[in-house]
């Protein structure tokens, strides 16, 4: 089955008809099956300093790092955060995951979350549960200083993996 891909704005005219607009051009397309992929961006929490601080990345930006951070802080203990925690720990980074819930993978069954945590701890990943990130800032060496419940910790880089939104 062939697939036609359009990079355009679209709106439904009816159940099987969409209107697509790309720049000045527009057309209507009829199909039995229409798949819409709206994309998604990282959900950025309103943490003071998150947007302004250097060496703070979303899941796309951290993949572009040219050097491995020795110390990586990860805000978010869901699927994305844990995937990167495992990857960077196995590459040699000292990884600390901060999760606001009382356990990682809060949407999964308890046993799954517990086993994942145990396996990752065996790989050297540290976890801070019930975290409350108050602020991020850079020191004079551009290290990221993360404040959790007022306690400050220093990282070479911080990943915020707090979900995706359309």
Language-model features: where?
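Rossmann-like dinucleotide-binding cores of NAD(P)H-dependent redox enzymes
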Residues: 63-64, 69-73, 79-140, 148
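FAD-binding core/adjacent interface of flavoenzyme oxidoreductases
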Residues: 1-75, 132, 145-166
